[in-house]
Amino acid sequence: MLVYQDLLSGDELLSDSFPYKEIQNGVLWEVDGKWVVQGAVDVDIGANPSAEGADADADEGVDDQTVKVVDIVDTFRLQEQPPFDKKQFVTWVKRYIKLLTPKLEGEQQETFKKNIEGATKFLLSKLSDLQFFVGESMGDDTSLVFASYKEGATDPIFIYFAHGLKEVKC
């Protein structure tokens, strides 16, 4: 299994269990998330309640707490952040580029520098529709993960900066 860690913080942000599609000349990855239900307990002890005279709809004191979560957010313990306005986002991108560029090597660095402007404009065009997430450490100088919904979709898509991820074999 491959895990993708944030190059700046080491937080696990993605794994190969979630296939990605490269967008914006490979600078960004798009990953489909899914809403899932957690905590549902379905216990079947094989008894026939109607034969025992019990009400089939009786709860019998079991508190079955279910929660709907997005699989990627839950799996990698992503922490939602307040939304950014345009000025805050541009400030974050500039700092991110400054921190990330020295960690990239050769061709990767050139590709990143060449295409980051287009990727930034792409994200700016969607800014009001984006949700912002960081990894578990919640550091200030980390990669952001963006979530949004395509028109008419019920499940979110997640957008990652590809060059900000380090592939680690587990």
From Swiss-Prot:
PANTHER family: TRANSLATIONALLY CONTROLLED TUMOR PROTEIN-RELATED (PTHR11991), TRANSLATIONALLY-CONTROLLED TUMOR PROTEIN (PTHR11991:SF0)
Stretches assigned to the TCTP domain: 1-170
UniProt source species: Fragaria ananassa (Strawberry)
Biological role: Involved in calcium binding and microtubule stabilization.
Family, per entry: Belongs to the TCTP family.
Protein name, per record: Translationally-controlled tumor protein homolog
Cellular component, GO annotation: cytoplasm
Domain of life: Eukaryota
Location, primary (coarse class): cytoplasm
Localization (cell): Cytoplasm
Alphabetical list of Gene3D superfamilies matching this protein: Metal Binding Protein, Guanine Nucleotide Exchange Factor, Chain A
High-level lineage: Eukaryota, Viridiplantae, Streptophyta, Embryophyta, Tracheophyta
Keyword Mitochondrion listed: no
Keywords from the UniProt entry: Calcium, Cytoplasm
GO MF annotations, alphabetized: calcium ion binding
A UniProt-annotated Pfam family: TCTP
